[in-house]
């Protein structure tokens, strides 16, 4: 194996960049997905604080996902076609969840007090849908896109675990960014 040959090291570089992009997405968008799933708990004032803590960052975090998928498409177009064909439904549902989150976040900011409850629920549903679908896709990918009941069950289990992991990251974010009763509630949600 000649490491000076571009055909040897270039795929390794692209896989490393894709891995970095997906890791950054999971960490950076994971905390705001987690905060979104924690949004149903708390009073209206606490919900404002929770949304305010992610407000400046949440939209830019999804850029890492776009970068990772873009690298997959440009570096490995055949793999991109196979993976997205196998994961068409969960990818579509994840995109629906991400779009719902964006709409809910923007409309919530302009909504009257009576309507904020609806947009909070929409933000929660979008966050839960996106995180669960990401976990399901990860589980399906790990097993090689199985069509068996056991493979589907594994994907569902990983979906639940990824959602729980994002809630953990979101609670840690709230512990760092808030104080008082909301911070104590975030600490309790860890245990």
Predicted regions and their residues:
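Loop-centered beta-sheet repeat module
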Residues: 146-191
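Select subsegments of transmembrane alpha-helices in polytopic membrane proteins
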Residues: 56-64, 123-131, 190-191
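Membrane-embedded alpha-helical segments in integral membrane proteins
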Residues: 13-16, 67-79, 136-144
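Transmembrane alpha-helical segments that form the membrane-embedded catalytic/substrate-channel core
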Residues: 27-30, 99-103, 163-173
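Juxtamembrane membrane-water interface segments of multi-pass membrane proteins
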Residues: 33-56, 73-81, 105-116, 171-189
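Membrane-interface helix-loop-helix junctions at boundaries between adjacent transmembrane segments
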Residues: 82-91, 100-162
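N-terminal signal-anchor module of multipass membrane proteins
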Residues: 1-60, 66-69
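Alpha-helical transmembrane segments and their helix-start/interface "positive-inside/aromatic belt" motifs
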Residues: 12-15, 116-127, 186-191
